[in-house]
């Protein structure tokens, strides 16, 4: 059976955008992120806020190629970019003094991808 990739048109647009930015900027992190987002939904990352709290430091830029979920607590001020956020995850990130942004917004802020951590 032929692999079709994601059927969500917004996700397809994001993947094309990531590949284009990777080629324009010469940065491999965006191509890697596009590859991770192309995976089947059941293999896509689902990261809880507690995992971000465990592994991140204050001021880190974290990108999740999937969903951020609200289980656990967050005590660090971090910038988190992801494909999707649950309502509780978005609330906990902003209450801790961090930011929950889209992947496109992260690329606008940091087109070279320096200091970005991919978390799965």
Swiss-Prot record:
One of its GO terms (biological process) is translation. GO terms for molecular function: RNA binding; structural constituent of ribosome. It holds the Pfam family Ribosomal_L18. InterPro entries: Ribosomal_eL18 (IPR000039), Ribosomal_eL18/eL18-A/B/_CS (IPR021132), Ribosomal_eL18_arc (IPR022947), Ribosomal_uL15/eL18 (IPR021131), Ribosomal_uL15/eL18_sf (IPR036227). GO terms for cellular component: cytosolic large ribosomal subunit. Keywords: Ribonucleoprotein, Ribosomal protein. Belongs to the eukaryotic ribosomal protein eL18 family. This is Large ribosomal subunit protein eL18. It comes from Pyrococcus horikoshii (strain ATCC 700860 / DSM 12428 / JCM 9974 / NBRC 100139 / OT-3). The lineage of its organism: Archaea, Methanobacteriati, Methanobacteriota, Thermococci, Thermococcales. The gene is rpl18e.
